[in-house]
C-alpha cells in the first residue's frame, strides 16, 4: 500500500484550533454550541474541538455522539452484520444549532445519514457540518461549513484521518490500495 502523510500531529493540532476559531466566529452571539461527533473518528475530533472552544472562549459546548450505522443507504452492501456502537446525545437538539463533526467528507452519504439520525432526536434550528478533510467526489448535494483541509483525490485513493483515541496517533494520510 502506497501511503503519504499529508498532515502530521502538530499540523493537525493547528488545523483543529483553526476550525474551533471558525466555529466560534460563524456562531457569533451563541452562548451555547452543540457538537455531535459521527462515530467513529468524528467523536474524538469533536472532543478536541470542544476543548479548544472552551479554552479560547466563554461559550458552553454540549457534546454528543451519533451512530449512523442503521441510517446508511449502503448498509447491506458494506456491513452484512453491522456493529452498532450507540448514539449518545444527552441534550435536546430542538431549537439548537448543531454542528456535526466527521473525519472525511466524500460522497455525502454519511452526512445525509447523520442528518436523518439527528432529526429523529428533535428539530434543530440549524445543522452545520465540520470535517477534517473534504476529498470531493460528491454523490449528494452536501457541502461542509467548516473544512480542515481540502484534498482532491482520485477514485482509487483514500484518506485516513487517524486519531489518538482510535489509532494511537494523530495524522492524516493519503493512500492507494494495492490492486
PLM feature segments, named:
Residues 1-179:
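PRPP-associated nucleotide enzymes
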